[in-house]
A protein has these predicted regions:
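Conserved aromatic
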Residues: 128-129, 182, 352, 426
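Composition- and surface-driven signal marking solvent-exposed, interaction-prone regions
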Residues: 193-195, 260-263, 297-299, 360-365, ...
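Short, glycine-/Ser/Thr-/acidic-enriched flexible segments
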Residues: 186, 289-290, 353-355, 429-431
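An internal, short helix-loop-strand segment that often contains or flanks glycine-aspartate motifs
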Residues: 72-106, 142-245, 249, 266-280, ...
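C-terminal regions of mature proteins
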Residues: 497-520
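Active-site proximal loops enriched in glycine and acidic residues that flank catalytic Cys/His/Asp
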Residues: 286-288, 334, 350-352, 426-428, ...
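Juxtamembrane low-complexity tails/linkers enriched in Ser/Thr-Pro and polybasic
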Residues: 1-2
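Structural boundary/hinge residues at secondary-structure and domain interfaces
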Residues: 6-12, 16-161, 207-229, 247-345, ...
Length: 522
């Protein structure tokens, strides 16, 4: 064989071997990267979590948050202090990585724990190749040397405590695969426990079903459950201009007596109630009621106050009355009185199948009230308008109004009247007269632009819906409302700028919540 031929063969072989070596190196590096990508962050989340926020693209999510109308008005989403800190330093951190954040690090998860406050949260993210070194460089550059961090051992793992400029302390659990941060060292310890003993949120079958991979992932997803209201429910999050949308699904089908399972027993209703609500209404609910027994039983379970035997007996009598006479829809509302400094007026409106018979039976019911129970106040008074006098009936003491509306009323007195084919109930006579007079004058909510805009995003057929103008609602210190989670009140400085619209629809046993937060521009 000629020398030239041997040289060609040697060069060709070297190139082939070099390419093969490079291919193998790339394959193993890709395999390692895929291994990191497959790390399940949910295996770190303690089972005590009440809500979880997750995004697979933190940069895109932050960009969408910055593009919201509220952000442009310097009203930033501060419901998570950890996220606020991350957002503050995210672009700085990105500058430290010339090729951008790794795919693993771009995924972020925050778990929320009871009692719900800005400190009882944990932030998690995966780490790709080189991310650990990136974080170390970032910490060395931006953490003050005047207050050096301290490291503690817990079950063989390092927890580093960093003092913050505002006096808080940030606990960090950092490995080559992931990072977990919290203002509570004890929460980081529970993260380590979940990671080591394998008892995490990932092992909860209800949560695992809700968090199953999706074909079309949203920019962010929230998983939440509320005791007595709903089990783990998935909400895809979308942000645009004046709106924050949460489109959800709840597969929970267990036998727990939750509000979601009560909805499954009801038929849907159609149409929005704006024409039958005062223009000053700032909160209302509307729902279908075809199974009164389950709805009344749920309300009875939610009531925490002490009831006398007389009140329990009256509750049963009025429950039977409603089951015999009420129709298939229920509307509850809060609205302003003429003196806006007074506590809000409250009215429950029920459709009635036969008004004449319902009124006759109501008169019979109040006639059974004993002289001692009646007291000196008359059982029947009148609400006078320009065209008519409406009889107003003072019912025996009952807690059904609170059970059906979710309003924590300070009194067990209830007043009733019939108006436009509906039974109206209220905790005081003034609420009834104010309601009737506003509607008689045509002063209804349907004319409000904010109301109509919110309805545009909702379905005309549903099982339950809610509207809450938080700015007005937060001024009602005496009103505790069952259907509005305390989370909104604890973050009132941000949410007071929003109106909440929520709708729950049931199809084939699956509940589909649809929540819209509309920003009220100045």
């Amino acid at each position: 064989m000629k020398l030239r031929t041997r040289v060609k063969i040697a060069i060709t072989s070297s190139v082939v071997l070099l390419c093969a070596g490079f291919a193998l190196y790339s394959f193993f590096r890709l395999s390692a990267a895929e291994g990191k990508k497959d790390f399940n962050l949910y295996e770190l989340v303690p089972p005590s979590a009440s809500a979880v926020f997750v995004t697979d693209d933190i940069l895109e999510f932050v960009a969408e948050v910055d593009d919201l109308a509220c952000s442009k008005n310097q009203q930033y989403l501060h419901v998570s202090k950890l996220f606020s800190y991350l957002k503050q330093y995210l672009y700085t951190l990105q500058e430290e990585a010339p090729h951008g954040l790794s795919r693993q690090m771009n995924q972020m998860l925050i778990s929320f724990h009871e009692p719900d406050n800005i400190h009882n949260q944990v932030l998690y993210c995966r780490l790709g190749e080189g991310d650990r070194q990136l974080i170390d460089r970032f910490v060395q550059k931006y953490v003050s040397s005047l207050y050096p961090p301290k490291t503690f051992k817990y079950k063989g793992e390092d927890i580093t405590i960093y003092p913050m400029a505002d006096g808080d302390f940030l606990a960090c659990y950092l490995t080559s695969d992931f990072m977990a941060l919290s203002y509570q060292k004890k929460l980081i310890e529970t993260v380590i426990d979940a990671h080591k003993n394998g008892k995490s949120l990932a092992d909860d079958p209800t949560f695992a079903e809700a968090a199953a991979p999706k074909k079309s992932p949203a920019v962010a997803t929230v998983y939440a459950h509320l005791e007595g209201m709903m089990g783990w429910t998935e909400f895809d999050m979308k942000l645009r201009d004046d709106f924050i949308y949460f489109t959800g699904v709840c597969h929970e089908t267990d036998t727990c007596f939750t509000f979601m399972n009560v909805l499954r027993q009801q038929e849907s209703v159609e149409g929005f109630p704006g024409e039958a609500l005062p223009s000053t209404a700032f909160y209302f609910t509307k729902q279908g009621v075809t199974d009164w027994a389950s709805l009344l039983s749920y309300g009875d379970m939610q009531e925490t106050g002490v009831r006398t035997s007389d009140v329990r007996n009256r509750n049963r009598e009025l429950s039977h009355y409603l089951m015999e006479n009420a129709g298939q829809e229920l509307v509850a509302c809060l609205f302003q009185r003429e003196d806006t400094l007074q506590e809000a007026a409250a009215v429950l409106s029920l459709s009635v199948s036969d008004v004449t018979e319902a009124e006759r039976m109501l008169r019979s019911l109040i006639n059974t009230v004993s002289a001692e129970e009646r007291g000196k106040a008359p059982l029947i008074t009148f609400c006078y308008t320009a065209n008519k006098a409406y009889p107003v009936y003072r019912l025996p003491q009952t807690t059904l109004f609170t059970q059906l509306t979710g309003f924590a009323e300070p009194t067990s007195h209830t007043y009733a009247t019939f108006y436009e084919g509906r039974l109206l109930l209220a905790p005081d006579e003034n609420s009834l007269s104010r309601y009737i007079r506003q509607l008689d004058k045509g002063e209804v909510l349907n004319g409000a632009i904010a109301y109509r805009t919110g309805m545009d995003n909702l379905s005309d057929s549903y099982h339950f819906m809610l509207m809450a103008d938080f700015d007005h609602l937060f001024h009602q210190a005496a009103k505790q409302i069952h259907f509005v989670p305390d989370f909104f009140l604890r973050n009132s400085e941000f949410f007071r700028n929003f109106i909440l619209f929520a709708q729950f629809t049931c199809a084939d046993g699956v509940i589909y919540p649809n929540i819209v937060l509309r920003y009220k521009s100045e």
